[in-house]
A protein has these predicted regions:
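Structural preference for solvent-exposed beta-strand-turn elements
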Residues: 1-161
Length: 161
């Protein structure tokens, strides 16, 4: 799989396939970093069923974005570069931990994510982000510390599974 973000030219995620999965919520951090705003449609379900996205939205706010929830979806906006923060998640959600990692790696300053998910896919994501230039430390007790960097580079990675 080749992922090329240089072809992205808008802060808006369109609806056609996005209501069938939960992926659009994970695009908010990237679009905030690139455009200073992100608009994503309301999430659809997945094999697990309908799940809330409030941890993702709260995380974006903790990093300095403002988030509006509308019937059609979510709009997040930042005034300049996102700022590192300390965020204790109410539950160790895999998706919300991914959002926090994506928000933090390009934010200014240090971020600490507490009560983070530690599933294998999170460890693989951290490995990938480190190979792209991210500075990430793991502490016991579900704590991840991230030093924000100015930019990330491309990478090659083999995915588990």
């Amino acid at each position: 799989m080749n992922i090329d973000p240089t072809t992205v030219n808008t802060h808006k995620v369109t609806t056609p396939d996005s209501r069938n999965n939960r992926l659009p919520i994970l695009l908010i951090p990237f679009l905030l970093h690139k455009y200073g705003q992100a608009t994503v449609p309301t999430m659809g379900g997945c094999n697990i069923g309908k799940r809330k996205v409030d941890f993702h939205l709260t995380a974006a706010e903790m990093f300095g974005a403002t988030v509006e929830t509308k019937e059609s979806g979510y709009h997040a906006k930042s005034n300049g570069r996102l700022q590192g923060t300390h965020y204790t998640m109410p539950y160790p959600s895999v998706g919300a931990t991914e959002s926090c990692l994506f928000l933090s790696v390009l934010s200014e300053g240090t971020s600490v994510i507490r009560n983070a998910a530690i599933e294998p896919e999170i460890m693989e994501l951290i490995t990938m982000l480190r190979s792209m230039g991210a500075i990430i430390f793991l502490n016991p007790n579900r704590e991840i510390i991230i030093e924000g960097v100015e930019k990330l580079t491309g990478t090659n990675m083999y995915v588990l599974g």
